[in-house]
């Protein structure tokens, strides 16, 4: 029955709400359809407008029509995304809510509904809810499996001879494996872990700091003492059993807000061997028998006596050297920032540095430099843009090459082969290469293997050709001897990259162990530039199998998803390695990378790896010069204070605007939700003998996702899969540990299956790599919960140790 009598209040409200929703979806949906997106939004919008009209007319046909809408939505969403709870929610949440609203008796009666006329709609809503319920029990992004548990190599080589109970380097050893042979804490008892001690560095951000400040430090441990750097590179020596601070050394960091970021990832350790000599053959000094080498963001390296906290006066100028002078072509504060601990050999410090990304064509060189560990004398250089990369500066060649490719993360070192493996990035500017020379791209990006004594090239492997995406090799490579099918052990190097590919090479020669065939990629660079026709793509990869499409577009509601779909279709996107463009290009994997600086945790006995890849698209838009975007910096111009937003690229035709692919509806409220369906972060287990990803699970919850927004409220701890920034740890106790996720937890995983066995709430973000060690037979797990303000996570100053309770 229909009626044209005056509608009641609830019918008016219903008509108004449906009309508003319908108008938004019709207009937006027409836009989506016009630029190549799905027709569903405009169809739904028109159906809502019709439902609004019928409701206003008090016509019960509104109930029948909306039943068809709900049924149609269920069919559409299951066809497009299947039983994926997070993909279903934005496609059906508003439709279900509106359907339930129409079923409310005080609403349905006012539009002429009866028990009979509401049944089809009730059934449709029930089916939609049932689809959501069923999707709770399946995860199409999940890979289940068991890593092998048998020991493939009971006595893996350790040229550094690190005691099992200690952690001497960033990756425990300079092989970069992030694995410990300790097993007191294991899969059967890890749920009993308790806080053993908790201290504060009291080193927090201040008003003079740059926009990006990160606490990414991984401690080292020996002689029952932890050594680590804080935000402003203060060096702490902490009793590993009690947390008592033994001493603090302050390098008096000289900083200004123009720095791109403030970061210290860790320190290095050198112990004087018996009968040691320096690089000139003179007897090594007797003082500072144990040295801590501290990188400082203003361009210095400082050596400190591990026992006393005093500088080693015989090193450089009273314990420090300046890596910038006298041979850097430009010494603008903040352009050259040592952020990662250097490689240490018996006699040398091999140091690299971060260079400001997308800054200028007039920037410091990324040359690798080796210094005498006792005196600070420079012994060799590797300046990647120089035709002779080992040429030391002299009167005819007083400075390094400007903008030479650099390495900003930790290198690895094989003492037996005497080779140092340097993960290289492209020289800045990063997203445009029209002016690059062959020399400037000869060693970037990729892995450079150098003789540690001389800096002479052993081999080079390029991971990206003519890089226009800032696809540096971002992680310390892992060195492990891997069993081949014929039973032989091959010395391998595993290099995780931002593209999601893990390049597996024979570390003696640089030859591929796992094939990485050259693969055609999208063409068409910006005017004045070019693209490589192919890129190497490793067959060991965590890169998504398929390019992004409409089924991958997400949002909190159907409205957000529609605007994300508009955003998606206005960008250039043709799959991996889509070139940057003036209209804006979608880069996936994005600039943050599937792998970042955390690297892999590799068990050399079981020959398995634990990883925490990221799955977050970015947008890269080249911006032609014009008002507010000058070719060269104006007087008193400052740095960007971060690596997203408008990056100046002074001296080339374009600046570049870089940012994650985020929901444009929520972003004005400071809510940074990606436009790609979650998960945005995983944990994964890899069998290194078969080079297969055996298990992969979404990791992390929504709980802290609102931090930094205008609505900083905690969300329910519902697992969604959030990005993580920091490294994993694995142990012989069949455990993996990770603290780096965007929610504030330390988690322990069964290394065989990836199942979470234990977690504990942290007071701040812990975008760092945890370590483990043992003192007096007691094993500890330690992490630095210091936060990362541009990730963003809450800042802190907390060093926290966990251990099993003492037996009574």
Swiss-Prot record:
InterPro entries (alphabetical): PQQ_b-propeller_rpt, PQQ_mDH, PQQ_rpt_dom, Quinoprotein_ADH-like_sf, Quinoprotein_DH_CS
Cofactors that this protein relies on: pyrroloquinoline quinone
Any one cellular-component term (Gene Ontology):
outer membrane-bounded periplasmic space
One short Pfam name that applies is PQQ
Keyword check for Cell membrane: yes
Membrane disposition: Multi-pass membrane protein
Instruction: Name the keywords, alphabetized.
Output: Cell inner membrane, Cell membrane, Membrane, Oxidoreductase, PQQ, Signal, Transmembrane, Transmembrane helix
Residues in the signal sequence: 1-33
User: Where in or outside the cell is it found?
Assistant: Cell inner membrane
User: SUPFAM superfamilies in the record, alphabetically?
Assistant: Quinoprotein alcohol dehydrogenase-like
- Can you tell me where the transmembrane regions are? 35-54, 59-76, 94-108, 123-138
User: Where is region (Disordered) located?
Assistant: 514-545
List where Polar residues composition bias occurs: 531-541
The top EC class is: oxidoreductase
Main location per UniProt? membrane
Q: Which GO terms describe its molecular function?
A: quinone binding; quinoprotein glucose dehydrogenase activity
EC number of this enzyme: 1.1.5.2
Q: What does it catalyze?
A: a ubiquinone + D-glucose = D-glucono-1,5-lactone + a ubiquinol
Cite the active-site annotation.
470 (proton acceptor)
* NCBIfam families registered for this protein in UniProt: PQQ_membr_DH (TIGR03074)
Q: Which family does it belong to?
A: Belongs to the bacterial PQQ dehydrogenase family.
Q: What else is known?
A: The P1 form can oxidize only D-glucose, while the P2 form can also oxidize maltose. The sequence of P1 form is shown here.
Name of the featured protein: Quinoprotein glucose dehydrogenase
Organism encoding this protein: Gluconobacter oxydans (strain 621H) (Gluconobacter suboxydans)
């Amino acid at each position: 029955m229909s009626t044209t009598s005056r509608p009641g209040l609830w019918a008016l409200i219903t008509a108004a709400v449906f009309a508003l929703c319908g108008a938004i979806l019709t207009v937006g949906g027409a836009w989506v359809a016009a630029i190549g997106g799905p027709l569903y939004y405009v169809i739904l919008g028109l159906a809502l407008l019709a439902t609004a009209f019928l409701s206003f007319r008090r016509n019960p046909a509104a109930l029948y029509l909306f039943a068809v809408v709900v049924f149609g939505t269920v069919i559409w969403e299951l066809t497009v995304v299947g039983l994926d709870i997070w993909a279903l929610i934005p496609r059906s949440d508003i439709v279900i809510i509106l359907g339930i609203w129409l079923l409310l008796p005080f609403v349905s009666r006012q539009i002429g509904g009866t028990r009979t006329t509401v049944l089809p709609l009730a059934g449709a809503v029930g089916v939609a809810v049932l689809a959501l319920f069923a999707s709770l029990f399946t995860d199409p992004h999940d890979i289940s499996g068991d890593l092998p548990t048998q020991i493939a190599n009971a006595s893996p080589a350790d040229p550094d001879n690190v005691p099992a109970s200690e952690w001497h380097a960033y990756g425990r050893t300079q092989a970069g494996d992030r694995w410990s042979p300790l097993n007191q804490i294991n899969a059967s008892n890890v749920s009993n872990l308790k806080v053993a001690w908790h201290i504060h560095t009291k080193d927090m951000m201040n008003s003079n700091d740059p926009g990006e400040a990160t606490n990414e430090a991984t401690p080292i441990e020996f002689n029952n003492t932890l050594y680590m750097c804080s935000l402003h590179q203060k060096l702490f020596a902490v009793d590993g059993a009690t947390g008592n601070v033994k001493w603090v050394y302050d390098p008096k960091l000289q900083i200004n807000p123009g720095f791109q970021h403030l970061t210290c990832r860790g320190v290095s350790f050198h112990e004087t061997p018996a009968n040691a000599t320096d690089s000139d053959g003179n007897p090594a000094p007797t003082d500072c028998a144990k040295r801590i080498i501290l990188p400082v963001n203003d361009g210095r390296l400082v050596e400190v006596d591990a026992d006393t906290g005093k500088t080693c006066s015989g090193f450089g100028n009273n314990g420090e050297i300046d890596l910038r002078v006298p041979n850097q072509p430009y010494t603008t504060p903040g352009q050259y920032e040592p952020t990662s601990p250097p490689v240490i050999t018996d006699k040398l410090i091999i140091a690299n540095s971060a260079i400001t990304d997308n800054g200028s064509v007039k920037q410091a060189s990324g040359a690798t430099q080796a210094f005498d560990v006792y005196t600070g004398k420079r012994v060799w250089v590797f300046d990647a843009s120089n035709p002779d990369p080992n040429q030391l500066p002299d009167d005819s060649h007083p400075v390094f090459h400007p903008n030479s490719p650099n390495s900003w993360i930790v290198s690895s070192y094989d003492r037996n082969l005497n080779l140092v493996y340097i993960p290289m990035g492209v020289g800045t500017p990063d997203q445009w290469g029209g002016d690059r020379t062959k020399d400037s791209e000869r060693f970037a990006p990729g892995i450079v293997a150098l003789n540690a004594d001389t800096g002479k090239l052993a081999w080079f492997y390029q991971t990206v050709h003519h890089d226009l995406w800032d696809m540096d090799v971002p992680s310390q490579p892992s060195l492990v001897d891997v069993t081949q099918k014929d039973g032989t052990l091959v010395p391998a190097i595993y290099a995780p990259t931002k593209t999601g590919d893990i390049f597996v090479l024979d570390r003696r020669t640089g030859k591929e162990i796992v094939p990485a065939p050259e693969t055609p990629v999208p063409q068409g660079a910006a005017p004045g530039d070019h693209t490589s026709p192919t890129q190497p793509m490793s067959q060991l990869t965590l890169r998504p199998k398929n390019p992004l499409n409409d089924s991958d577009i997400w949002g909190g509601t159907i409205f957000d998803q529609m605007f994300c779909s508009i955003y998606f279709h206005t960008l250039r996107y043709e799959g991996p390695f889509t070139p940057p463009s003036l209209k804006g290009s979608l880069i996936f994997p994005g600039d943050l990378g599937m792998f970042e600086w955390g690297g892999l945790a590799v068990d050399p006995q079981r020959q398995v790896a634990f990883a925490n890849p990221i799955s977050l698209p970015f947008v890269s838009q080249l911006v032609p010069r014009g008002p507010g975007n000058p070719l060269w910096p104006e007087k008193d111009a400052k740095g960007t204070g971060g690596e997203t937003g408008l990056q100046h690229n002074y001296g080339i035709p374009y600046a570049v605007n870089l940012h994650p692919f985020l929901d444009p509806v929520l972003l004005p409220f400071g809510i940074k939700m990606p436009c790609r369906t979650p998960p945005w972060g995983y944990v994964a287990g890899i069998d290194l003998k078969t080079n297969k990803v055996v298990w992969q699970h979404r990791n992390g919850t929504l709980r802290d996702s609102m931090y930094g927004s205008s609505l900083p409220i905690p969300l329910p701890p519902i697992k969604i899969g959030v990005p993580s920034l920091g490294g994993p740890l694995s142990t012989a106790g069949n455990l993996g540990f990770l603290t780096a996720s965007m929610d504030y937890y330390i988690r322990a995983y069964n290394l065989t299956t990836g199942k979470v066995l234990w977690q504990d709430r942290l007071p701040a973000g812990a975008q760092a790599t945890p370590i483990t060690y043992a003192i007096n037979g007691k094993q500890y797990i330690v992490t630095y919960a210091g936060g990362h303000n541009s990730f963003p996570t809450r800042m802190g100053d907390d060093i926290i140790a966990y251990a099993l309770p003492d037996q009574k």
